[in-house]
Amino acid sequence: EATTAIPDGAEITVDATNGIVYEGVVADLVKPKAAEASGGTAGTTVVAAESVPVTGTKIYMNLGNPDLAEKYGTLPCDGIGLMREEFIWTTFIHEHPLYLIETGRPDHVVDQLSEGIRKVCQALAPRPVTLRLSDFKSSEYRNLKGGDKYEPEESSALLGWRGASRYYDPKYVEAFKLELQAVRKVREEYGFKNLNVMIPFCRRVDEMQKVVDLMAQEGLHRGPDFKVWLMAEIPSNIILADQFNQFVDGYSIGSNDLTMLIMGCDRDNDTVAPLFDERNLAVKRAIRHLIAVAHKDGKTVSICGQAPSVYPDFAEFLVKSGIDSISVNPDAVISTRKHIAQVEQRILLDSLTGKGRADTEDYTW
């Protein structure tokens, strides 16, 4: 198709890793040919940027600031595994959604959210973008203009009114509908069908059903071209994965909250912070169990915490457990892809020779 759509003589940049053709010369993907040894100036011929290996495990990227999407979109990632919506709220919207509704300005939410999301989808297209819907805690919502009128004072906001529990609550549902309108605008008006969504902090299976039903009522029907992911960050998501499966297309493990809740350990508390460790056997068993149960029903599993890029042994554990994708910060995309490629090669070699190292821990659930 490209050979007929691109006119002869046109300058293009081909990203062979991701299967993308860019119009013109994309400076971030190419570098100038070195100056001739005779002392001549650098030529205009371009050569490929740093080569990166192809991996069976998809390497996604985490992103918060939409204005950085074009810059980081040139990285050899397979898409956005976690787009944080909160950055748009604090940087461009500034005001509590219920306050904006009360003052007659709900369109401000839809316009700002859709514009930020559009930038990311456009920069990454046709690669998928997974938007995590709002996950502010009540204390963070109170910091938005007008928020003190609508938000409770919670002694433990981390475990309070956040994530999915807000979406269907009569006190907040109209605000959540604005988020869904923004998603629909990006997909339908702007035409970026590479946008999918992720539901954070969903404690119960019936909550997940309520959220999926609510999205359908707002014109966002889960299907082949619109995926709904669940942020697996609560032990109930792991224990009841066989039931959550019927309402989701996949999971993205939020290793920070999941570790904290499994270990009963506040990583922000200096006294017990040393006990916080994603590599603890309890966490590993939970992750491996989730992958097995999800795969049984054809669901995919990703992880979007920092652990895979910080601890090479943890990344190896994930690949050996069969994880489908890993999402890391932009500065870790290339190094993580290289490391994962080495792990996959090692696994293949061990399989061929039958002389691989046995697991040193028992991951049986």
Predicted regions and their residues:
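Conformationally flexible catalytic loops at phosphate/diphosphate-handling active centers
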Residues: E1-P7
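Short, Lys/Arg- and Gly-enriched loop/turn segments at beta-strand edges
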Residues: I6, N18-V26
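Acidic/polar low-complexity surface segments
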Residues: A27-P32
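Conserved alpha/beta-domain cores
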Residues: K33-W365
